[in-house]
Amino acid sequence: MEVSGHPQARRCCPEALGKLFPGLCFLCFLVTYALVGAVVFSAIEDGQVLVAADDGEFEKFLEELCRILNCSETVVEDRKQDLQGHLQKVKPQWFNRTTHWSFLSSLFFCCTVFSTVGYGYIYPVTRLGKYLCMLYALFGIPLMFLVLTDTGDILATILSTSYNRFRKFPFFTRPLLSKWCPKSLFKKKPDPKPADEAVPQIIISAEELPGPKLGTCPSRPSCSMELFERSHALEKQNTLQLPPQAMERSNSCPELVLGRLSYSIISNLDEVGQQVERLDIPLPIIALIVFAYISCAAAILPFWETQLDFENAFYFCFVTLTTIGFGDTVLEHPNFFLFFSIYIIVGMEIVFIAFKLVQNRLIDIYKNVMLFFAKGKFYHLVKK
């Protein structure tokens, strides 16, 4: 029994490594890419004074503000419009003259770049930093999407397996699920044919065969000679020797050519993103998962970001996971938020799955509407 278990274990290990290896590689590349970007941006941007603060624009703004305010009380009401319009010219960088690009803040900036969040209150100010940021995003964003796609396959497998198990419970009734699930989930697959089912035999009579019929060939020496020549030619054709050629390795079994581990890795790379496309669960369930996932972070975030309550923290997490990133909520301790990097990656993938399911439902609705018009039902309703 022990001897027979070794070959099975040897087959399972390469397959398991082949499934985990692409995701681990993508994740390691992303972490390395973020660390390298943090080192580069902290070296370029640290201690730089904002250019906009040195060109006299801020001083001109203050002089104009003093001129507007240096008036009597009777003129104040008339100058309110001028004051309001002038205050709209305020630039945020005037009140943050020196940037603080430590390693952790630079790492936080890199994460906001390739995750396409971009809160807006951390940004490069030097010309080299801006050019480097564009180049960094060109390679970082596709790498982030690769990680999200591979993570999405894992999440889709977990969600699909969990949902199929919960469907077996009594409270998951079919009328309840049929409101939110596509009909494809309830279609019964046809039963396979039994193995012992009799296969109908096709009998062809001798009269239906082409060529001379049995018993119709005249007993002549020419007829027998003709049959002999045909059989001799057929035998000679079958035994014809082909010229020797160079032996080539067959590609019918790629595992022998590449090795079991390499073949498993390549085959799993070809299947990246397929599980997300096949996932199909009810919208209320995925909406509940998104709400619970964001609520967990919203409950933890105010412990170190004391200026945020649960409502504002929930809003901040939602804006982050949907990659909107308005920048209206500024974190006082962004370094702590780096510990939520895995949370952000998984959360972005959950939100992406939710959007994908909503997109599929909208496509189904659109198809049903088009079929409704195509079948002429709308014409008959209008005619009535």
From Swiss-Prot:
**What is the originating organism of this protein?**
Homo sapiens (Human)
Entry's transmembrane regions: 24-44, 130-148, 281-301, 335-355
**Cytoplasmic membrane side:** 1-23, 149-280, 356-384
* Taxonomy, superkingdom: Eukaryota
Q: What is this protein called?
A: Potassium channel subfamily K member 18
Query: What would be one Pfam family of this protein?
Result: Ion_trans_2
Q: How is it modified after translation?
A: N-glycosylated.
* Region annotation (Selectivity filter 1) ranges: 116-121
Q: Which residues bind K(+) 1?
A: 116-117
For this chain, one GO molecular function annotation is: calcium-activated potassium channel activity
Q: Where is this region: Interaction with YWHAH?
A: 249-254
Annotated keywords? Cell membrane, Disulfide bond, Glycoprotein, Ion channel, Ion transport, Membrane, Metal-binding, Phosphoprotein, Potassium, Potassium channel, Potassium transport, Transmembrane, Transmembrane helix, Transport
Question: What are the start and end residues of each intramembrane segment?
Answer: 103-129, 314-328
Activity regulation behaviour: Activated by volatile anesthetics but inhibited by amide local anesthetics. Inhibited by Ba(2+) ions. Inhibited by free polyunsaturated fatty acids. Channel conductance is sensitive to intracellular pH, it decreases at acidic pH and increases at basic pH. In contrast to its mouse ortholog, it is not regulated by extracellular protons. Insensitive to changes in temperature.
Question: What is its biological role?
Answer: K(+) channel that conducts outward and inward rectifying currents at depolarized and hyperpolarized membrane potentials, respectively. The outward rectifying currents are voltage-dependent, coupled to K(+) electrochemical gradient across the membrane, whereas the inward currents can be induced in response to activation of Ca(2+)-mobilizing receptors. Homo- and heterodimerizes to form functional channels with distinct regulatory and gating properties.
